[in-house]
Design a protein with these regions (language model features):
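Bacterial N-terminal signal peptides
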Residues: 1-6
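Substrate-binding/active-site clefts of carbohydrate-active enzymes
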Residues: 12-44, 48-201, 217-220
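Short catalytic-loop micro-motif centered on adjacent basic/acidic residues
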Residues: 205-211
Length: 220
């Protein structure tokens, strides 16, 4: 489950009269054919048919080779990924926007990867928007890490969000640590990340990954 958002003057949401034609600018295992450096020379051609491009998660992420497509983010403020460097990403966004194409970031904030079960999240430095270090105390208490002796007593006292619906709606994400969005520190870090992605990297909007994993009241 995901949610798309385009920046407006108030909240990040899709306008009622939405007429853009979107291109998904990647595939699950397309690191070679859709790297930033490969897409950049095609920016003008893309602009002939599309007004919006959805790019894959651009933050540094867990995994190697074709298994690392960005959906287990390791450090949000590090925009060097398997798709290319931050410099290459910014150059791609600049060329797309020069042709009138808006660019969506694939945002993964439901969960984080680290060095261990409950520790090892690198510090995120968003410059003027703040510096944040998420810790074990920012992980939901019902995360899989709760079963690890090394994490005993370290997790937050917050449960993961659940829609009170069948299991496919809400609940935890086993492959990485679930962040407790009910905590102010987590929400502040996410907010700084989004503003930084817009103002510093140049994105126009967001596609939210695993949006079912946290309270929708926090997306606005």
């Amino acid at each position: 489950m995901s949610l798309f958002g385009i920046f407006s003057q108030a909240y990040a949401q899709v306008p009622l009269a939405f007429h853009d034609v979107m291109l998904q600018g990647f595939m699950w295992n397309s690191h070679t054919t859709t790297k930033w450096s490969v897409l950049k020379p095609q920016a003008s051609e893309i602009a002939e048919s599309f007004t919006l491009v959805w790019l894959p998660p651009s933050a540094a992420a867990e995994g190697g080779g074709t298994s690392n497509v960005g959906y287990h983010p390791y450090q949000w403020s590090n925009q060097n990924s398997s798709w290319g460097t931050r410099t290459q990403l910014e150059a791609l966004i600049t060329d797309l926007k020069a042709g009138g194409v808006k660019v969506l970031a694939d945002i993964v904030v439901n969960h984080r990867a680290g060095n261990g079960w409950c520790d090892g999240f690198p510090t995120d430095n968003f410059g003027e928007y703040g510096v944040f270090t998420l810790k074990a105390s920012h992980i939901t208490k019902d995360d899989e890490a709760s079963g690890q002796s090394a994490c005993s007593g370290k997790l937050s006292d917050q449960n993961d969000w659940n829609f009170d619906k069948p299991i496919e709606y809400g609940g935890g994400y086993k492959a990485a640590r679930d962040l407790a969005h009910s905590l102010t520190e987590v929400r502040d870090a996410v907010k700084a990340y989004l503003i930084w992605m817009k103002n510093e990297i140049g994105y126009d909007g967001f596609r939210w990954d695993v949006v079912k994993g946290f309270n929708p009241a926090y997306i606005r």
